[in-house]
Swiss-Prot record:
It comes from Actinobacillus pleuropneumoniae serotype 5b (strain L20). The gene is cmoA. Catalyzes the conversion of S-adenosyl-L-methionine (SAM) to carboxy-S-adenosyl-L-methionine (Cx-SAM). Its EC number is 2.1.3.-. InterPro entries: CmoA, Methyltransf_25, SAM-dependent_MTases_sf. This is Carboxy-S-adenosyl-L-methionine synthase. It is an enzyme of class 2 (transferase).
Length: 241
């Protein structure tokens, strides 16, 4: 696993964070050291696939990055009669995802598309995953995407929505942000790395509160919604049609 050192030296002109070649190269290390509970979420996505994915249906991983979620799903399926569709708009991520998926033999077909997730038709889906993806979309586009997902899910289909959260109570919000930064420092990131990455992300990752997410999911059509995992200001929700 290549180590993330992208923000380790001072960057004079710090632009917005993008999922480019340099990020794709170190992404597994970056996300493990940056997102508390990430491996637990990936493992649980496989468990949820085992329970919810049905024969003859499709599974979508929207914002699939290098394919960790897809591999977890595929390992846990009860049937081979399923198609998994992964979508990411970063070509470097897609290339590595395809290579990663092809390294493990399976009878389950997987298609990896380089596209904007807002352009993808969702149909005959028993499971859709948005793993730390929605927060990178403009807020104005989020409800439309979730509504499309709801409409494309079969009855009893599941959406897994993992996000970084903001909290309306400012004291708690600052505490959880600080704990997250402590987590990153404990994983070997310097103050400079934490600071520069935060600055690079502030215009492209727009976080919402848990309440906002629940309200939006209800507007999209879901009625069964629950937060099933949280560590500091990161977590994951499930919504069942």
């Amino acid at each position: 696993m290549n180590k993330d050192t992208i923000f380790s030296a001072p960057i004079e002109k710090l632009g917005d964070f993008t999922f480019d070649e340099s990020v794709a190269e170190v992404f597994p290390d970056m996300i493990q050291r940056s997102v508390p509970g990430y491996s637990n979420i990936i493992t649980a996505i496989g468990m949820l696939a085992q329970r919810f994915v049905t024969e003859g249906s499709q599974v979508y991983d929207l914002g699939c990055s290098r394919g960790a979620g897809i591999l977890s799903i595929r390992r846990n399926l009860q049937t081979n009669q399923v198609k998994i569709i992964g979508v990411d708009n970063s070509q470097p991520m897609v290339e590595r995802c395809r290579s990663h998926i092809n390294a493990y033999h399976s009878e389950v077909p997987v298609e990896i598309l380089c596209d904007d997730i807002r352009h993808i038709e969702i149909k005959n889906a028993s499971m859709v995953v948005l793993n730390f993806t929605l927060q990178f979309l403009p807020r104005a586009d989020r409800l439309e995407l979730l509504t499309k997902i709801y409409q494309g899910l079969n009855p009893n289909g599941i959406l897994v929505l993992s996000e970084k959260f903001t909290f309306e109570n400012q004291v708690m919000n600052e505490l959880l942000i600080d704990l997250h930064h402590t987590f990153k420092r404990a994983n070997g990131y310097s103050e400079l790395e934490v600071s520069q990455k935060r600055t690079a992300l502030e215009n492209v990752m727009l976080t919402d509160s848990i309440e906002t997410h629940k309200d939006r999911l209800k507007q999209a059509g879901f009625s069964q919604i629950e937060l099933w995992f949280q560590c500091f200001n990161f977590g994951s929700m499930i919504a069942v049609k």
